[in-house]
Amino acid sequence: MSVRSVIRGSGSALPRRAVSNAEMTTMVDTTDEWIVERTGIRNRYIAGEGETTSTLATEAARKALEAAGVDASRIDLIVLATATPDQTFPATATIVQHNLGCNGGIAFDVAAVCSGFLYALATADSMIRSGMARCALVIGAETMSRLLDWEDRTTCVLFGDGAGAVVLEAVDVDETDPKAPGILATRLHADGAHNELLYVDGGPSTTGTVGKLRMKGREVFRHAVTNLANVLKEVLETTGHDAEEIDWVVPHQANFRILDATARKLDLPADKVIVTVDHHANTSAASVPLAYDTAVRDGRIKPGDLVMFEAMGGGFTWGASLARV
């Protein structure tokens, strides 16, 4: 027997305000056809007054706890992935911890932008396997709208706000049982040589400002497809599974073209890929858990399914994780 981190439940949260492509056309020089053709996005949610990264994260966490049947008092670790914290410090995870009333455990943020949830998941998994924690909340939460240049039509139409969370619990499993639940393997990578392709042009130690998001979309697309396909293969090789065994792929919801191209490169059927980018747009670190929770709640992802999570973000950072849920 050995310890694995098992996903016990998931939750998600969205701001109140939905913004359609039609509404976007009143804000910037664009069209619904242009946005849909290039990205697949039709809608996004934008945070309003009183809605912050921590409020969205707290709501998603509460829903995940409810789905898992776990009381907040049992949570001894919160890892929150975000590029849009409420404040430079303290960590937004500590605010969520206080909101949930589970003070005293471990709580911190990780910053890997769109790959953030996978970095957070790997961190929590490692801490559970090492015995430092037994029951964890892993959260991806963003208010990306507050980093956008609303005069840059090439970027402001792509992003939205939201949060997703999962409860991870330490469980003793028989590793020889192919159906045993838990996270099987995660692989993470980064390459800072390309940080000028996707970045925010501000920060506390440089400009003293928040800054705005800047992106060179074509170059990002090229790197994304190659890196994601390679890291998925790496995880499959590590676990000894074949692509045909995967029940569902839950990718970072950046752009439908990237999702489609990556699936084609791995010969994965399109109907095995969870797609929510049309409804949520790119929610950065929130997109993977938000898509996962959507598919769990609508009945597509079921207990016992083999699920591959994957993402790539600014830095570049990228990774993939395979789990039996």
From Swiss-Prot:
Molecular function GO terms recorded: 3-oxoacyl-[acyl-carrier-protein] synthase activity; beta-ketoacyl-acyl-carrier-protein synthase III activity
Superkingdom of this protein's organism: Bacteria
Its catalytic activity? malonyl-[ACP] + acetyl-CoA + H(+) = 3-oxobutanoyl-[ACP] + CO2 + CoA
| Main location as per UniProt | cytoplasm
Gene Ontology cellular component annotations, sorted alphabetically: cytoplasm
EC number(s) given by UniProt: 2.3.1.180
Tell me yes or no: is Transferase among this UniProt entry's keywords: yes
Q: Which UniProt keywords apply?
A: Acyltransferase, Cytoplasm, Fatty acid biosynthesis, Fatty acid metabolism, Lipid biosynthesis, Lipid metabolism, Multifunctional enzyme, Transferase
Answer yes or no on keyword Lipid biosynthesis: yes
Give the signal sequence positions. none
Q: Name one GO biological process term.
A: fatty acid biosynthetic process
Q: Where is this region: ACP-binding?
A: 253-257
Q: Which residues form the active site?
A: 114, 252, 282
In which compartments does the protein localize?
Answer: Cytoplasm
Pathway(s) = Lipid metabolism; fatty acid biosynthesis
On subunit structure and binding partners, the annotation says:
Homodimer.
- Family, as annotated: Belongs to the thiolase-like superfamily. FabH family.
Role summary:
Catalyzes the condensation reaction of fatty acid synthesis by the addition to an acyl acceptor of two carbons from malonyl-ACP. Catalyzes the first condensation reaction which initiates fatty acid synthesis and may therefore play a role in governing the total rate of fatty acid production. Possesses both acetoacetyl-ACP synthase and acetyl transacylase activities. Its substrate specificity determines the biosynthesis of branched-chain and/or straight-chain of fatty acids.
Q: What is written about domains in the entry's comments?
A: The last Arg residue of the ACP-binding site is essential for the weak association between ACP/AcpP and FabH.
Protein name in UniProt: Beta-ketoacyl-[acyl-carrier-protein] synthase III
Q: Which organism is it from?
A: Novosphingobium aromaticivorans (strain ATCC 700278 / DSM 12444 / CCUG 56034 / CIP 105152 / NBRC 16084 / F199)
